[in-house]
């Protein structure tokens, strides 16, 4: 089992490189947002709030943007 884990997470396998890249991106996220200074439970609360706010913004944009775009196109008489 240990050999299998080393092969998957090794630096030469594509899965290992992808994992290393995702780890590096997560580390950059922690540094840029200064989350590395928070305790784990505080980090979880912050990330939960961030995911919920982004999710609500995406959902709202998906539901309401087509109506607004169509209204703008009707206003400028691009669409009859």
Curated annotation (Swiss-Prot):
Molecular function terms from GO: serine C-palmitoyltransferase activity
Predominant localisation class: endoplasmic reticulum
Site annotation Within the serine palmitoyltransferase (SPT) complex, defines the length of the acyl chain-binding pocket, determining the acyl-CoA substrate preference: residues: 37
Ranges per topology, Cytoplasmic: 1-21, 67-80
KW Nuclease (keyword) present: no
Pathway: Lipid metabolism; sphingolipid metabolism
Membrane-spanning residues: 22-38, 44-66
GO cellular component: endoplasmic reticulum membrane; serine palmitoyltransferase complex
Topology class, membrane: Multi-pass membrane protein
Record's keyword annotation contains S-adenosyl-L-methionine: no
Descriptive protein name: Serine palmitoyltransferase small subunit A-A
Organism name: Xenopus laevis
């Amino acid at each position: 089992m240990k050999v299998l884990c080393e092969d998957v997470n090794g630096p030469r396998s594509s899965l290992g490189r992808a994992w290393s890249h995702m780890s590096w991106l997560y580390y950059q996220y922690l540094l840029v947002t200064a989350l590395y200074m928070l305790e784990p439970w505080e980090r979880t609360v912050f990330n939960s709030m961030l995911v919920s706010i982004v999710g609500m913004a995406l959902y709202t944009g998906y539901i309401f943007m087509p109506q607004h775009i169509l209204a703008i196109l009707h206003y400028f008489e691009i669409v009859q």
